[in-house]
Curated annotation (Swiss-Prot):
Residue positions binding Mg(2+): E69
Region of interest (Disordered), residue spans: 419-447
Top-level taxon of the source organism: Eukaryota
Function: Tubulin is the major constituent of microtubules, a cylinder consisting of laterally associated linear protofilaments composed of alpha- and beta-tubulin heterodimers. Microtubules grow by the addition of GTP-tubulin dimers to the microtubule end, where a stabilizing cap forms. Below the cap, tubulin dimers are in GDP-bound state, owing to GTPase activity of alpha-tubulin.
Binding site for GTP: Q11, E69, S138, G142, T143, G144, N204, N226
Keyword terms: Cytoplasm, Cytoskeleton, GTP-binding, Magnesium, Metal-binding, Microtubule, Nucleotide-binding
Highest classification ranks of the organism: Eukaryota, Viridiplantae, Streptophyta, Embryophyta, Tracheophyta
Natural source organism: Triticum aestivum (Wheat)
Protein name: Tubulin beta-2 chain
A GO MF term: metal ion binding
Length: 447
């Protein structure tokens, strides 16, 4: 019941996904061979959200793994939980996308997409009542961004009424892997705005900062970064998988977080984050969790919520705690920081409580916020995009795969529109109600 189909694409997506399955297997007491070794009935009660039970009693993840080169997939297959996946669900090409969005979206990816869709269909048919899809990918490369967005649009066509949640790793401001990241990211955002329902925005630099500052890791590896992401991913869906007092699911999350359909890019955070050594000395209380969860340093993307305002937010608490205390703390946050919330959406913070904490913690919380300050991410990518596109730098790699310059111009203006929309609602106040009736006709001055 309420199954979620997980899809991971590209190197980044597959590495995050592999880590995520380690976390979920751990929570449900499933060992690397797919056998259940847990102790609590609660682990099995709704295990079928993420797993299929095979005839021999093994649990197989509802996961589709795709990439345009075999490398990363081989390392997933030989990794700790590599044997748990269905062998047919590994779909890969041989050529690679070479960090080129056009290869992932139009040429190489388009050749592979049908075999991916076959696997997706097969998995979806195995579901009793499919809730939606979650996609892990990065926006800077070729496969995750190009082929990832292609798959999202194809799934959108075939399953228009199912939720589409993405965990998208944006290019970082200072750390860059490839020079064409701004192109790939802008072309991807153009697709995500139209075809995804909810995008959790992540970025390596913010994750590095958390590892470095909060977790006191001197040399964080991608494994550490991906562990943070997977904690958040597991938190977002814990209400579907374990009983709770105040439940939420992907659709409730969307209804509560998205006031305007295009503005569905969320910041995420997780608490408690403590360095490995000092874990056991920390007393966890709901106020402490709440404080850390709302802390700007805790956000997993390089945008500062203090530079904008929250349209909406949602907090998912896990563990044995009083619902009353959770509600009081959330109201408290809103009252103390009222200037950071838009006043024209009353009660814009939703909380949910799930009784089962993550492994090794007594309580934890996941934060998802829709803040106008996320425009900082888009602005930054857009500036980098424009400075290259103005000179038509590296463009031949894309036009050579059959793309047209028009597509770049469209993607650029779509991203700039998105930024303006966020800015417009950031500046809006509740006494301006009358002004919005005729906004379509009048050009706005502040754009």
């Amino acid at each position: 019941m309420r199954e979620i189909l997980h899809i991971q694409g590209g190197q980044c997506g597959n590495q995050i996904g592999a880590k995520f399955w380690e976390v979920v297997c751990d929570e449900h007491g499933i060992d690397p061979t797919g056998r259940y070794t847990g102790t609590s009935d609660l682990q099995l009660e709704r295990v079928n959200v993420y797993y299929n039970e095979a005839s021999c009693g093994r649990f197989v993840p509802r996961a589709v793994l795709m990439d345009l080169e075999p490398g990363t997939m081989d390392s997933v297959r030989t990794g700790p939980y590599g044997q748990i996946f269905r062998p047919d669900n590994f779909v890969f090409g041989q050529s690679g996308a070479g960090n080129n969005w056009a290869k992932g979206h139009y040429t190489e990816g388009a050749e592979l997409i049908d075999s991916v869709l076959d696997v997706v269909r097969k998995e979806a048919e195995n579901c009793d009542c499919l809730q939606g899809f979650q996609v892990c990918h990065s926006l800077g490369g070729g496969t995750g961004s190009g082929m990832g967005t292609l798959l999202i649009s194809k799934i959108r066509e075939e399953y228009p009424d199912r939720m589409m949640l993405t965990f998208s790793v944006f290019p970082s401001p200072k750390v860059s892997d490839t020079v064409v990241e701004p192109y790939n990211a802008t072309l991807s955002v153009h697709q995500l705005v139209e075809n995804a329902d909810e995008c959790m925005v992540l970025d390596n630099e913010a994750l590095y900062d958390i590892c470095f500052r909060t977790l006191k890791l001197t040399t964080p590896s991608f494994g550490d970064l991906n562990h943070l992401i997977s904690a958040t991913m597991s938190g977002v869906t814990c209400c579907l998988r374990f009983p709770g007092q105040l439940n939420s699911d992907l659709r409730k999350l969307a209804v509560n977080l998205i006031p305007f359909p295009r503005l569905h890019f969320f910041m995420v955070g997780f608490a408690p984050l403590t360095s490995r050594g000092s874990q056991q000395y920390r007393a966890l209380t709901v106020p402490e969790l709440t404080q850390q969860m709302w802390d700007a340093k805790n956000m997993m993307c390089a945008a500062d919520p203090r530079h904008g305002r929250y349209l909406t937010a949602s907090a998912m608490f896990r563990g044995k705690m009083s619902t009353k205390e959770v509600d009081e703390q959330m109201i408290n946050v809103q009252n103390k920081n009222s200037s950071y919330f838009v006043e024209w959406i009353p009660n814009n913070v939703k909380s949910s409580v799930c009784d089962i904490p993550p492994t090794g913690l007594s309580m934890a919380s996941t934060f998802v916020g829709n803040s106008t300050s996320i425009q900082e991410m888009f602005r930054r990518v857009s500036e980098q995009f424009t400075s290259m596109f103005r000179r038509k730098a590296f463009l031949h790699w894309y036009t050579g795969e059959g793309m047209d310059e028009m597509e770049f111009t469209e993607a650029e203006s779509n991203m700039n529109d998105l930024v303006s929309e966020y800015q417009q609602y950031q500046d809006a106040t509740s006494d301006e109600e009358g002004e919005y009736e005729d906004e379509d006709q009048e050009p706005e001055e502040d754009m």
